[in-house]
Amino acid sequence: LNAWYCPKWFKGRHSIEGLEHITEAKAQGKGILLLGTHSTLLDAGGYICAQYFDPDVVYRPQNNPMLDMLIYRCRATIYQQQIDHDDMRGLVRRLKDGGAIWYSPDQDFGLKQGVMAPFFGVPAATVTAHRRLLKISKAVAIPLYFYRYGDIRNPKYKVLIEPMVENMPSEDEVEDAIRVNKIIEAQLRIAPTQWMWFHRRFKTRPEGYEKIY
């Protein structure tokens, strides 16, 4: 909530590493798909990023219209654009225009929208929509992660931007899903308690496997 109502909280408390990867992609006129996770610090990380470049965000409208309006209005102070995750044309258009869109391929939307790939060694339905977005828009994929560290009474915040993912998308959607899951695994190992584990990542189970939830 600090990112919405008290952004000055982050002054002198944050750092950003790897900004040159964003700068380089923008200098080449490329759109950027920022591969991130559903972190509890989503809007804090977005606010910090907005001090250095203009981020956009993919979102799913809330079921409660009042809550949806509140979140949308608050995030409008952080992100350049908020694009519905079902609006593929809007996402492609923004990427073609050179936007940098935060996108999180870390949820289970079933096998109609993905493939099975190991996630921390457990088979998990992994979305593949990012492959289509990248292929159509000619954008690049850049992993981005943000986390909190230090004393809980005086925390620090860091944004970590990694180099562009080479050859993404490839010709193999399963291999691409495995690569994306490995990127997310590496991010979560930095601060595992700050990921939204309640999102039922293993909801879809392969045939013959017992349900977890």
Predicted segments with their positions:
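A generic structural signal for residues located within well-ordered alpha-helices
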Residues: 17, 37-40, 129, 193
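A conditional alpha-helix N-cap/helix-loop micro-motif detector
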Residues: 12-16, 39, 64, 84-85, ...
